């Protein structure tokens, strides 16, 4: 039995990146042998085991043979005579097919190290096209490693486009599409993921709402997305939710010069695409809530300086800022990202600090003092609202 470190851990180690998860490959063994050593079997379709002490994953070397459509139609062979090379060739990219033994020796039968040095994402073999999920994975890797200068090899890009035009992507479940998309949203350059899918004509099958917007709107959405990533850098927030809401707002975007006249038109467009987009991708509830808030209220936030105090408190109540201040901040970030994309001559977004300041002032009103003053039942809420409006009004008067 021989054990090798494989996959992303070896790749990231060679790129001098932090290694998050370590996956191990076991060659020349059987399920019974690993079970006798105390490993816990967790794999259903093929044997994957959890180490009794480190709790890291160990998989038996295997081969895969296509037996149907989509990404689940495979027959696996994990007999002990499967070699290291047999297992590595079934992987998606050469840079993910490098192994390392216990002594640190590297095994690179498919020239992954050369592609790492050349910053290329290249598929290993024609079997790449047997698994349509790899199209999304490669697009995600393109986004993940873009800041390091990586690009997709032309022949791999061509194969990805072939899979797309043949309709193979339609076999992917919404859950798997969202999983890869969410991972892409967490990268430093998520716009590369969507630009890659556009380039290979994959968007109509995966995200038709994004595929049907104009070229101008798509470019605008990608600019806003880059802005969002920049704004939340080093921040403790739900990055994938912020990025998704930013893209959503890009889809329903109406040119600011026509915003007033087309407001109703935009609202109708949003109502039409909202359930379709969220259902198509199985978007988590939090992401959906943030996106809907951004779509419904971004114009109010852009025009924050013109809002009356009672309107601001009413909006704060609708946004539930009192219980969900983090979501409020993320909503402002989404709007700031779009404002910067719209107004290139005004990169700052004073509305964000303005509304945060009003929120912080309104939060100084203590409901306990209102109760102590003798207010009861509905009177408490009415007085709380009155005092919050008054507090906000004082801050507003300090602004020109």
UniProtKB/Swiss-Prot annotation:
> What chemistry does it catalyse, as a reaction equation?
a tRNA precursor + 2 CTP + ATP = a tRNA with a 3' CCA end + 3 diphosphate; a tRNA with a 3' CCA end + 2 CTP + ATP = a tRNA with a 3' CCACCA end + 3 diphosphate
Stored InterPro entries: CCA_bact (IPR012006), HD_domain (IPR006674), NT_sf (IPR043519), PolA_pol_head_dom (IPR002646), PolyA_RNA-bd (IPR032828), tRNA_CCA-adding_enzyme (IPR050124)
Gene Ontology molecular function, alphabetical: ATP binding; CCA tRNA nucleotidyltransferase activity; magnesium ion binding; tRNA binding
Amino-acid positions noted as binding Mg(2+) in the UniProt annotation, renumbered to this chain = 21, 23
Which positions does UniProt annotate for ATP binding? 8, 11, 91, 137, 140
Which SUPFAM superfamilies does the annotation name? Nucleotidyltransferase, Poly A polymerase C-terminal region-like
In which residues is CTP bound?
8, 11, 91, 137, 140
Q: What is its EC number?
A: 2.7.7.72
Gene3D superfamilies, from UniProt? Beta Polymerase, domain 2, cca-adding enzyme, domain 2
For the biological process aspect of GO, one term held by this record is: tRNA 3'-terminal CCA addition
Entry function? Catalyzes the addition and repair of the essential 3'-terminal CCA sequence in tRNAs without using a nucleic acid template. Adds these three nucleotides in the order of C, C, and A to the tRNA nucleotide-73, using CTP and ATP as substrates and producing inorganic pyrophosphate. tRNA 3'-terminal CCA addition is required both for tRNA processing and repair. Also involved in tRNA surveillance by mediating tandem CCA addition to generate a CCACCA at the 3' terminus of unstable tRNAs. While stable tRNAs receive only 3'-terminal CCA, unstable tRNAs are marked with CCACCA and rapidly degraded.
What extra comment accompanies this record?
A single active site specifically recognizes both ATP and CTP and is responsible for their addition.
The text of the family note is: Belongs to the tRNA nucleotidyltransferase/poly(A) polymerase family. Bacterial CCA-adding enzyme type 2 subfamily.
UniProt xrefs under NCBIfam families: PRK10885.1
| Protein name (Swiss-Prot/TrEMBL) | CCA-adding enzyme
């Amino acid at each position: 039995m021989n054990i090798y470190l494989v996959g992303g851990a070896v790749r990231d180690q060679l790129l001098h990146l932090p290694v998050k998860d370590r996956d191990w490959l076991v060659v020349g063994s059987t399920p019974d042998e690993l079970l006798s050593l105390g490993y816990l079997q967790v794999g259903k379709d093929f044997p994957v085991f959890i180490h009794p002490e480190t709790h890291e994953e160990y998989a038996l070397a295997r081969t895969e043979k296509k037996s149907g459509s989509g990404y689940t139609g495979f027959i696996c062979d994990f007999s002990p005579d499967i070699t290291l090379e047999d297992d590595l060739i079934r992987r998606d990219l050469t840079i993910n097919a490098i192994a390392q033994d216990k002594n640190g020796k590297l095994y690179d039968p498919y020239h992954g190290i050369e592609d790492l040095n050349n910053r290329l994402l290249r598929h290993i073999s024609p079997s790449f096209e047997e698994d349509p999920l790899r199209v999304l994975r490669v697009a995600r890797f393109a986004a993940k490693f873009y800041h390091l200068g990586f690009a997709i090899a032309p022949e791999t890009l061509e194969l990805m486009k072939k899979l797309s035009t043949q309709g193979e992507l339609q076999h992917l479940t919404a859950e798997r599409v969202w999983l890869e998309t969410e991972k892409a949203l967490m990268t430093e350059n998520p716009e590369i993921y969507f630009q890659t899918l556009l380039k290979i004509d994959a968007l109509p099958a995966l995200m038709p709402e994004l595929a049907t917007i104009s070229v101008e709107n798509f470019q605008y959405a990608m600019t806003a997305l880059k802005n969002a990533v920049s704004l939340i850098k080093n921040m403790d927030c739900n990055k994938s939710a912020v990025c998704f809401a930013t893209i959503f707002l890009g889809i329903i975007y109406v040119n600011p010069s026509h915003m007033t006249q087309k407001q109703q038109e935009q609202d109708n467009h949003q109502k039409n695409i909202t359930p379709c987009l969220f259902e198509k991708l199985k978007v988590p509830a939090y992401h959906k809530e943030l996106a809907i808030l951004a779509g419904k209220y971004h114009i109010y936030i852009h025009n924050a300086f013109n809002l009356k105090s009672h309107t601001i408190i009413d909006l704060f109540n609708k946004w539930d800022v009192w219980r969900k201040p983090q979501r409020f901040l993320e909503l402002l970030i989404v709007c700031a990202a779009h404002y910067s994309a719209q107004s290139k001559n005004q990169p700052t977004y004073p509305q964000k600090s303005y509304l945060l300041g009003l929120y912080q002032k309104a939060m100084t009103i203590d409901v306990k003092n209102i109760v102590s003053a003798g207010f009861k039942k509905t009177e408490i809420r009415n007085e709380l609202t009155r005092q919050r409006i008054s507090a906000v009004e004082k801050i507003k008067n300090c602004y020109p």
